[in-house]
Amino acid sequence: VQDHVIHFYHLHALDWVDITSALSADAAATSALAKSISDWPNSSQTYFQAVRDRLQTFVDSGQLGLFANAYWSHPAYKLPPEGNLLAAAHYLEALDWQREVIKMHAILGGKNPHPQTYHLGGMSIPDDPNGQHGIFPGRIAQLRNLANQALEFVQKVYLPDLLLVASFYKEWAGLGQGVGDYLAYGDFPIDTSGDPATLWLPQGLVFGKDLSRPPQPLDHNQIREYVTRSWYTYTGGDGAAKHPWDGETEWAYSGPQPPFDFLDTDGKYSWLKAPRYGNTPMEVGPLARMVVAYAAGHARVREVTDQVLAHLGVGPDALFSTLGRVAARGIETLVIAEKMLDWITELEANINSGNVAMHNGDLWDPSTWPDQAMGWGISEAPR
């Protein structure tokens, strides 16, 4: 939730939003625009006038920092000045919002990024229903309050802004198509069985942009890594493909000595191996997760996706595009932000029922391990 909002406003929005154009926006018209798409309280003429003045002071300072080297006023920017001022205001609000939201990471994970409480068999943070440490009733209340704040911002700021911006860039619904094949590992199991069918976000593969059929099941044995264009060598040569648990990481740098301007992409040019499913490159990430969920019949994902497509007046093929990837992050953010409140309620119910187990120590002692073993694990990254 936090990652997609930050990606939209702080890592990606300036591809669509011209900050300099916001300086010529009419504050009253911006207020009217904001109120036409959301009932977010920070929508008054006075508010947008203050934001515009703040931006003007920043520009007049001459110290533009990361905003100094950009394509301001480029004709490819489509938003009107009022849309740019609205987005700029929410860029600033999102900075404050994410500072609050990541308190959930600190409560459950110790820090952000890179949580510190995960370890073999569970988590190190205890359930403490009768104390003041770990997860206790006050912490549950704090988590619920933060989750509600997160959901409100997603519903009233992020999604309306995303739809507003997308409505001015509909041509991008036909641009940026990838390979057309999608893989999602799935996430958020509803029990401890390990059965992929119990994943709240489903697992599977969609080939050929086909949303009419259920996703194909994942077979981890089909995952392969190539080093044909990578600075490594494999036993068996560059044409060999290896499952990660059979993988080799033998450095063999053959690129130019620095400084250099270009890499020869017809040869080896990267430290990254090239993963394939069988011999097929697959798209992963937010769009892949939403495509697989849609094809799998995930009710809420289908509902929100259909609403977004209808609002923009585009068909399902628009998902497989640059615009589709932007929309997919918003769709995923909303459905997970909604679900977070359910998960907090479930955690509270577990604690109230006396189920305070946070760790399974059956395999904690190395003396219980076999002399040799092979295993595999899969997980998703937000972006």
Language-model segments: what does each one mean?
Residues 1-382:
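Active-site bordering "gate/hinge" segments
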